[in-house]
């Protein structure tokens, strides 16, 4: 008889807790997010910006067909990490809920309402048989009375942030936010910070590998930046990074000289 590891039953069953109180399938769904493309969001007083890594694996892929920031409604967008097919199902559901709310109440859906509905769906997929957890996290951002930015977890939990990252580069990006985020950021500063955090997670950052969109309280409509705009910001950021590296090397050499 083949040996069956003690945790095997908990691995297979979505609705059964392990003795130490974990749902293994939810943990595995989170692992899918940790291996996914990095997505970041930054909020400032008058708006929100999202920036996402585009992993184009072949030069034959049409870049325009590889969408990574999804518009839910005029005033709400989402950026996923993890299994994109799972994220697409969540995005389609969010779009449907936004349309139903608008038709029912005659006004745009509040982001908090939409986030809760999507997370209720995610949570249900951790509780019932015949389904599995969604292997995707979403950053959901938008404006109603104020700018808002949420992270949704595969478990169905959600959190509001000033600046946040998901995906494989989360730790690096969050460290950048901890060092550089300020409540006094303007639009220019927020966009630069988002692109900086994302660029730091990439081996070879380029305008083709970064997608950026933002919304302001004034317009209340999402706008995607074109490749030329991204290239402008990225060029400035990479130049600043080079200058910082040169200054650090100069400081290192100064310390060496002082030891002689």
From Swiss-Prot:
Pfam families: Proteasome, Proteasome_A_N. This is Proteasome subunit alpha. SMART domains: Proteasome_A_N (SM00948). Component of the proteasome core, a large protease complex with broad specificity involved in protein degradation. GO terms for biological process: proteasomal protein catabolic process; ubiquitin-dependent protein catabolic process. The keyword Amino-acid biosynthesis does not apply. GO terms for cellular component: cytoplasm; proteasome core complex, alpha-subunit complex. The keyword Protease does not apply. Belongs to the peptidase T1A family. Keywords: Cytoplasm, Proteasome. It comes from Thermococcus onnurineus (strain NA1). It is found in: Cytoplasm. The formation of the proteasomal ATPase PAN-20S proteasome complex, via the docking of the C-termini of PAN into the intersubunit pockets in the alpha-rings, triggers opening of the gate for substrate entry. Interconversion between the open-gate and close-gate conformations leads to a dynamic regulation of the 20S proteasome proteolysis activity. The 20S proteasome core is composed of 14 alpha and 14 beta subunits that assemble into four stacked heptameric rings, resulting in a barrel-shaped structure. The two inner rings, each composed of seven catalytic beta subunits, are sandwiched by two outer rings, each composed of seven alpha subunits. The catalytic chamber with the active sites is on the inside of the barrel. Has a gated structure, the ends of the cylinder being occluded by the N-termini of the alpha-subunits. Is capped at one or both ends by the proteasome regulatory ATPase, PAN. One of its GO terms (molecular function) is threonine-type endopeptidase activity.
